[in-house]
């Protein structure tokens, strides 16, 4: 057995100080961001929050719902390509899905 004697930090050792803001409400915050990808020269605009494959998250129905808010859904590699292509509104939210392949 190995005993580690180094000092370890805990949650009680960390303090986050909020930044001062001129906003009167959290509803006034704009979460939309635009990213330009260096090597493809493509841009993506939306809210940089991703739903990934965790216990049923990352399904086509979730992608449709999150796309209304310009959020990204990572679909699993188990999805059949034919099923993705046949999904009715795929063109509407296609820019907000990513395929995870698990390399």
PLM ranges: what are they?
Residues 1-103:
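Active-site entrance/lid segments in N-terminal catalytic domains of soluble metabolic enzymes
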């Amino acid at each position: 057995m190995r005993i580690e004697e180094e000092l370890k930090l805990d949650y009680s050792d960390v303090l986050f100080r909020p930044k001062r803001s001129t906003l009167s409400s959290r509803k006034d915050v704009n979460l939309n961001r635009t990213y330009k990808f260096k090597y493809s020269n493509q841009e993506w605009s939306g809210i940089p929050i991703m739903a990934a494959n965790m216990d049923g998250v990352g399904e086509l129905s979730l992608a449709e719902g999150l796309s209304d808010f310009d959020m990204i859904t990572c679909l699993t590699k188990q999805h059949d390509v034919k099923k993705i292509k046949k999904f009715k509104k795929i063109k509407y939210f296609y820019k907000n899905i990513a395929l995870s392949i698990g390399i």
